[in-house]
UniProtKB/Swiss-Prot annotation:
Organism: Pongo pygmaeus
Record pathway: Glycolipid biosynthesis
UniProt protein name: Lactosylceramide 4-alpha-galactosyltransferase
Catalytic reaction list: a beta-D-Gal-(1->4)-beta-D-Glc-(1<->1)-Cer(d18:1(4E)) + UDP-alpha-D-galactose = a globoside Gb3Cer (d18:1(4E)) + UDP + H(+); a beta-D-Gal-(1<->1')-ceramide + UDP-alpha-D-galactose = alpha-D-Gal-(1->4)-beta-D-Gal-(1<->1')-Cer + UDP + H(+)
Gene that this polypeptide is encoded by: A4GALT
Membrane topology reported for the UniProt record: Single-pass type II membrane protein
């Protein structure tokens, strides 16, 4: 694909001139149970701050054009946001607050504390609310409902491997921009690429090149 580039990620350079620089220096050589996902959490907010644009985890299947989404993040459940999808303008103050919160309230020993919980904390402060139910948007930042990016909760990840009729597929995902398939849970699960499993049909319809490659190994 001529419009796809693979670039190395220099974390020290990425975090330079941000609140994350000193934290990254301090964490070098220190063992923490979730350091890799924590580094991922730090990287995405730094990328959003420095460059803006759209960030997606690699376990997403995109269904619709995302270009009209700006200063948007997705709601995972009624209680928490998720940073697997982010769309922000360059140097947006919300991302600056995320970086500061990352350092000020750092705890690398709790799963999600530096990721979904951080975004939830910052959004509540941003909007001066106690519950996500109080506001979907304020001060130029919008949270979309779970069906936008997380139509199937992580607790129900096995549904991606269950059969579904082709007619039911568009109804299920009518309000969905992109589907997060919860690779942390689903990795290693086998399915037939040509089956009627929901994930197989998503690949066939929205990832035709990948789907053809998958069929070579049947």
């Amino acid at each position: 694909f001529p419009n796809v580039q693979m670039l190395p990620l220099d974390l020290r350079e990425l975090f330079r001139d941000t609140p994350l620089a000193d934290w990254y220096t301090a964490v070098q050589g220190r063992w923490e149970p979730y350091l890799l996902p924590v580094l991922s959490d730090a990287s995405r907010i730094a990328l959003m701050w420095k460059f803006g644009g759209i960030y997606l985890d690699t376990d997403f299947i995109v269904l619709k054009n995302l270009r009209n989404l700006t200063n948007v993040l997705g709601t995972q459940s009624r209680y928490v946001l998720n940073g697997a999808f982010l769309a922000f303008q360059r140097r947006h103050e919300f991302m600056a607050l995320c970086m500061r919160d990352f350092v000020d309230h750092y705890n690398g020993w709790i799963w999600g504390h530096q990721g979904p919980q951080l975004l939830t904390r910052v959004f509540k402060k941003w909007c001066s609310i106690r519950s996500l139910a109080e506001s979907r948007a304020c001060r130029g930042v919008t949270t979309l409902p779970p069906e936008a990016f997380y139509p199937i909760p992580w607790q129900d990840w096995k549904k991606y491997f269950e059969d579904i009729s082709p007619e039911e597929l568009p109804r299920l995902l009518n309000a969905t921009y992109a589907v997060h398939v919860w690779n942390k849970k689903s990795q290693g699960t086998r399915f037939e690429a040509t089956s009627r499993a929901l994930l197989a049909q998503l690949h066939a319809r929205y990832c035709p090149t990948t789907h053809e490659a998958m069929k070579m190994y049947l």
